[in-house]
Amino acid sequence: MAFTPFPPRQPTASARLPLTLMTLDDWALATITGADSEKYMQGQVTADVSQMTEDQHLLAAHCDAKGKMWSNLRLFRDGDGFAWIERRSVREPQLTELKKYAVFSKVTIAPDDERVLLGVAGFQARAALANLFSELPSREKQVVKEGATTLLWFEHPAERFLIVTDEATANMLTDKLRGEAELNNSQQWLALNIEAGFPVIDAANSGQFIPQATNLQALGGISFKKGCYTGQEMVARAKFRGANKRALWLLKGSASRLPEAGEDLELKMGENWRRTGTVLAAVKLEDGQVVVQVVMNNDMEPDSIFRVRDDANTLRIEPLPYSLEE
């Protein structure tokens, strides 16, 4: 990709974030095109793509036969098919799995590294972009297309925009916003996704969790009314038999080191500490605080105390911007 990622700065929590333009180099784009695109994706992901309009984007999971997620995908309609955004570390294996049955369908599934992914968030993000585009997405119309650019709107943790565009437009946006916006890399977008409670599936956690263990049902990412898709039986069983005992949590506090994806944490039990959970992602903010996204039992007490293994500092549960009550 000739468009160069911006140098990293320590990420900031959404409440204090100045206007920021980010390169999303840790995320990657992929597409499916061809006459059978919708039918093919409908048989592969947890969301009901047949009901998706041009104005919508949604989170969906692509699972194995046991209902474990290869990845989650931020899906939107693109050309005569669909495009999706996922973590770069899982794109290649996810596409390999997705292509397994494609020989029988009129589809082309491919990575897309021609287009550039940018994020805009922080103070007056909408006003800054309103000077550059004739229409911006919103709650009512979450996807807007203009020329070579697709803009996706996100409400949480605070209004922000994901821009899928060509290199020329990415350079133009950078030139126009450089004076008023801070530039940062994808760690800032990752921090916002952790705050929003959007599950982050990197390679270490691919094939490990059913969608409900990462709150996908609370994020509108699972249809329990659509026809068959890979892993559906296990995903449905988790709902209707109450088989899922896990949930995605947001922790905040201090840690002398950042836990890595796939690592466990420790839960305080009286005077002792017990290993628990699986870390999906973690970021250190500019104020020194650490935010951690972790899958744990769904019955954790809200005042529980956690720590990175053998660390002297502690982490506590923070509320997510959505409810898990069904």
UniProtKB/Swiss-Prot annotation:
Transmembrane residue ranges: none
Q: What is this protein called?
A: tRNA-modifying protein YgfZ
Q: Which residues make up the binding site for folate?
A: 27, 189
Where in the cell is the protein located?
Cytoplasm
Identify a single GO molecular function assigned to this protein.
folic acid binding
User: What GO terms describe the biological role, i.e. biological process, of this protein?
Assistant: iron-sulfur cluster assembly; RNA modification; tRNA processing
* The keyword tRNA processing is assigned to this record: yes
The family classification in the record reads: Belongs to the tRNA-modifying YgfZ family.
Alphabetized, the UniProt keywords read: Cytoplasm, Folate-binding, tRNA processing
Which GO cellular component does the record give, naming just one?
Answer: cytoplasm
Read off the HAMAP family from this record. tRNA_modifying_YgfZ
Q: Which PANTHER family match?
A: TRANSFERASE CAF17, MITOCHONDRIAL-RELATED
Main location per the UniProt record: cytoplasm
InterPro entries in UniProt: GCV_T_N, GcvT/YgfZ_C, tRNA-modifying_YgfZ, YgfZ/GcvT, YgfZ/GcvT_CS, YgfZ_barrel
Q: Which Gene3D superfamilies match?
A: 2.40.30.160, 3.30.70.1630, Aminomethyltransferase beta-barrel domains (3.30.70.1400)
Which NCBIfam families does the record associate with it? Answer: PRK09559.1 (NF007110), ygfZ_signature (TIGR03317)
Stated role: Folate-binding protein involved in regulating the level of ATP-DnaA and in the modification of some tRNAs. It is probably a key factor in regulatory networks that act via tRNA modification, such as initiation of chromosomal replication.
Q: Does the keyword tRNA processing apply?
A: yes
Q: Tell me where on the tree of life, at the top rank, the source sits.
A: Bacteria
